[in-house]
Regions:
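Hydrophobic alpha-helical segments, especially transmembrane helices
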Residues: 1-3, 60
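Sec-dependent N-terminal signal peptides
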Residues: 3-12
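Conserved, structured core segments of small domains
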Residues: 17-135
């Protein structure tokens, strides 16, 4: 009988803990980010292979620069060859702040990519750690 009582007490404690966790998870602190959507631009696919390589290297350097500044928190390409080429998520006050950071990106500057921006509401503290630098 003691064993049955012990099991019931433990089970009720676990259920209460699960209910508390579920309630806590629904109370995230929210904040506004800027979602950037990269699409093929009017000059997509133009130029020589050398130009494309130089532009892509500059594009990646700009991504690193924005990430190191703590402004670009998520970036990545799409997995197919459609018009949608990639996404950025910025921790920035406005699309104008993002525009100032991205207007020097060679892929955007050359018209190979076009950046569309939208305010985006999500959980505060959104981060993706670089596996090379995560400790």
């Amino acid at each position: 009988m003691k064993l049955l009582v012990t099991i019931l007490v433990l089970a009720s404690g676990l259920m209460a803990s699960d209910e508390k966790s579920a309630k806590d998870a629904s109370h995230y602190e929210m904040t506004t980010y800027v979602l950037g959507i990269l699409r093929k631009g009017p000059n997509w696919g133009s130029g020589t292979k050398e130009e494309s390589t130089r532009i892509q290297e500059g594009h990646m350097a700009n991504i690193r620069k924005m990430a190191e500044a703590g402004k670009l928190i998520v970036a990545g390409p799409m997995g197919d060859d459609g018009d949608l080429r990639g996404i950025f998520i910025f921790e920035a006050k406005s699309p104008e702040e993002v525009r100032a950071m991205t207007e020097e990106d060679p892929a955007i500057k050359s018209g190979r990519l076009v950046l569309e921006m939208h305010p985006w509401y999500a959980a505060a503290g959104l981060r993706v750690n670089d596996p090379k630098t995560a400790k």
